[in-house]
Amino acid sequence: MTHRDSTGPVIGLKLVTLLFTLSPELLFLGAGLKLKENGYDGLLVAINPRVPEDLKLITNIKEMITEASFYLFNATKRRVFFRNVQILVPATWTDHNYSRVRQESYDKANVIVAEQSEEHGDDPYTLQHRGCGQEGRYIHFTPSFLLNDELAAGYGARGRVFVHEWAHLRWGVFDEYNNDKPFYVNGRNEIQVTRCSSDITGVFVCEKGLCPHEDCIISKIFREGCTFLYNSTQNATGSIMFMPSLPSVVEFCNESTHNQEAPNLQNQVCSLRSTWDVITASSDLNHSLPVHGVGLPAPPTFSLLQAGDRVVCLVIDVSRKMAEGDRLLRLQQAAELYLMQVVEAHTFVGIVTFDSKGEIRASLQQIYSDDDRKLLVSYLPTAVSTDAETNICAGVKKGFEVVEERNGRADGSVLILVTSGADEHIANCLLTSMNSGSTIHSMALGSSAARKVGELSRLTGGLKFFIPDKFTSNGMTEAFVRISSGTGDIFQQSLQVESVCETVQPQHQLADTMTVDSAVGNDTLFLVTWQTGGPPEIALLDPSGRKYNTGDFIINLAFRTASLKIPGTAKHGHWTYTLNNTHHSPQALKVTVASRASSLAMSPATLEAFVERDSTYFPQPVIIYANVRKGLHPILNATVVATVEPEAGDPVVLQLLDGGAGADVIRNDGIYSRYFSSFAVSGSYSLTVHVRHSPSTSTLALPVPGNHAMYVPGYITNDNIQMNAPKNLGHRPVKERWGFSRVSSGGSFSVLGVPDGPHPDMFPPCKITDLEAMKVEDDVVLSWTAPGEDFDQGQTTSYEIRMSRSLWNIRDDFDNAILVNSSELVPQHAGTRETFTFSPKLVTHELDHELAEDAQEPYIVYVALRAMDRSSLRSAVSNIALVSMSLPPNSSPVVSRDDLILKGVLTTVGLIAILCLIMVVAHCIFNRKKRPSRKENETKFL
């Protein structure tokens, strides 16, 4: 047994204890975004490798963020700005002596620059998957947006757009406009434009020429073809989350300027709170006092980074514990797939093994051909040692030696650490690993290793996986496939399209059909693995009817694998496979299929699975997410199923949803989610997600995913209409003929504090986030998605609905708001749409008395509710909905200024024509005022 320093672990373990108390966002100390002394450090902007080289992009990115820094500083009342920024240049671009990356990569970037896919055009957008006040995934800009100065007319200055998107990303606020509901009727029975603040002015425009207001208003809403153009000169200073393109807009809507009646995402998701209220509640502004003085901060500094050759080292545990539970065999099978299929060509790969000491089995070798891949497979360990000790740090140290062979440094390299042993001395190499510049992905085999080895991944920005000791689990294979290059080039990545594992009785079969869709097919590999004896009888039938048998597969008896690589491009369509267990006892048979994109002209569908946080304490639930996309385009109506495997107990299968309710924030954004609370034991849990869809049910979303910058069609300038160029909508996507399937590991998470044995119910219904209210005559009709008995699963017992004329009362003192009798409302199963109708004036005498003096005056009713389960556990109070009430019957909504609807471009109209038009309109208004019968349909400017 090797001697170890006894003082190092004490210090290291204290560090580990400290790290456990920090939030997941702070655990990645080796890189990442930080706020220090009012300045953001480490903002990472990454350019996709498919973007053609253009140094003007770098120049414009610098100018955009510099402008954004000053704009942000003033908008936040001198609280935050950008101090230093890293720009990750693709490895495909010419090397201009850029600095080398350390742990930075495209898939960790805060901002990405990539070609827009399908019909999104050039809209900048932020991918938001969490709720109000919580961070998003990334900001996306297209090269065209950054290079084409003419787009500034529609979107506004790039720096202002960046701040709009930054508020989405960093502070979790939402758009204050709504393309689906551009108009609404306010509490004064006026038709208003959805905006914030309501002080922003403009005029209604009809596409069919000068027309009376009646032609633009039908049944209290605007006819298609009517639009609203804003005045280019405004007095309103807000809001950045509505229209930062207006020169006067320099701040976020606050408590005094917020338009809580507007039907936008900000009001829905944040319960009518202003964007500034949400932003000031963030940790950024809570811990940042305004900078003294009147001057601006220094401009940001920029560092240009570029990845070099990709360097990977497998660091494999061969201690005695690897003999348990077929761990070594499962490792061999998964590592063979990684080396033969997943790792990309031209990568340098080395292999290290360790028990109580480390050993280099293969120095770095670059992959050019399948022969190079087979040679690396031959270096995989074939037996475990007799040494019971596991010295993870010894293996990691040898791994660093291997990756440093390339250029003397570990910067930008990747270590894939696979271990089954608990090592109390792992803290000895935490700081070394964190400062190495290498990213460490860890796979913990069995429960004893899982709790500590993940720290190496957290500190270096790597992925961590927990692999249960079950041969029926395909988790290790899925983990290896998940570890991609991180470059963002999905056309080079291997995608897992099938993963099936079943225990098959003797002389019985595992048979199924899988799909090779039209976007994949290159470099397609079928891998069959078994548990004991010789290979099963294999029959594989392609869409044209060609049959492949066992003899067509390459058999590795030592690793118990059979692989078949389809030459060229695999035929698109349905493939059928049959595995017959010829062994005399039951055994687990597995089928894995991986493939690459078939063409650069068509983005393949991708699946990214992840959890909100990688550790939680009982009874806090875990939120599981699956980001399903075709390029950058959301895929809707797919069947998305998560499988969660605990250390002990049976797997839990859960369907993820994209309905905008429960754990899901935005409907139809391609991010499917669900609460998970079926905790069997304290410990680690492994996550895998499968996606399948039929072309008859799945569609591609038409709007831009997430929250995006508004493209303004035109403005009113000096009483003239100035239209911008039509927005670029791109091209329509090609419809998939066969549907598709994908599989992805979501890594692992840990749960602490789960009680032993039976315990009382501690899981309430989830918060209702999509409550809507609508006035129908004198009644209010409510609708929402039903929560469950436990979060978003099962069936809740009852609802508590309350209303008030005071927003403060309903939001801050819900228990004392007026109770609505909902005793006859029987809750439905989670996910079902609920409706409930009530009359506010009949709820209580208290409200009747409150309204007695101004019964004919318009007023707003605020409504919220919460659910209760059979254990009397209550959900959080829902989002707040409002509805405008009262006014005499038959009154029609009006537009709030003088009666005029403009059409076309008036820049060629002379001053005389304008004066004549004004006189005609004034004459019409004068005449209409004499006709009371038409007063109710009066149309006005906003």
Curated annotation (Swiss-Prot):
The metalloprotease region is responsible for autoproteolytic processing. It can also cross-cleave other CLCA substrates. It comes from Mus musculus (Mouse). Belongs to the CLCR family. Keywords: Autocatalytic cleavage, Calcium, Cell adhesion, Cell junction, Cell membrane, Chloride, Glycoprotein, Hydrolase, Ion transport, Membrane, Metal-binding, Metalloprotease, Protease, Signal, Transmembrane, Transmembrane helix, Transport, Zinc. SUPFAM superfamilies: vWA-like (SSF53300). This is Calcium-activated chloride channel regulator 2. The chain crosses the membrane at residues 906-926. Glycans are attached at N74, N97, N231, N235, N254, N286, N522, N580, N637, N821. Coiled coil: none annotated. Residues 927-942 are cytoplasmic. Residues 54-205 are annotated as: Metalloprotease domain. Residues 1-32 form the signal peptide.
